[in-house]
């Protein structure tokens, strides 16, 4: 049995976010927790290494609020990183580019919100540390 932890979307996926999101194998999503990894709990810009934040938040929502994990989507946006250590780390799995501008991120988030609402209308969104959130 395949156990899913979360989904990553790259800045390079822009223009195709809906198509990529449709690969999520769960038919129903009621709650999406999103991070861009830019401001992780005093640790700073962790890029895609920030996936633990949406996963952890959803675990908290499951344990404390009874949110069913099968209707949740932990989502990390790979919009680059300004962390030079990560950019130079050969083991870093994120896109090796400087973090996109606020204007570019805003356009990306607009496309993302439209796509998420078209695929799973009526869901709740929680943006955890994000540059624009």
Q: What are these language model-derived features?
A:
Residues 1-133:
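Metallocofactor- and cofactor-centric catalytic cores in central/energy metabolism, strongly enriched
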């Amino acid at each position: 049995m395949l156990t899913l932890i979360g989904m990553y979307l790259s800045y390079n996926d822009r223009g195709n976010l809906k198509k990529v999101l449709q690969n999520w194998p769960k038919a129903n999503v009621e709650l999406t927790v999103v991070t861009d990894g830019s401001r992780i709990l005093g640790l700073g810009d962790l890029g895609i290494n920030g996936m633990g934040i949406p996963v952890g938040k959803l675990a908290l929502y499951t344990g404390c609020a009874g949110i069913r994990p099968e209707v949740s989507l932990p989502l990390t946006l790979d919009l680059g990183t300004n962390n030079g250590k990560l950019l130079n780390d050969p083991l870093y799995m994120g896109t090796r580019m400087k973090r996109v501008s606020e204007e570019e991120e805003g356009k990306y988030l607009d496309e993302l919100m439209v796509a998420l609402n078209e695929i799973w209308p009526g869901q709740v969104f929680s943006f955890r540390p994000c540059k624009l959130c």
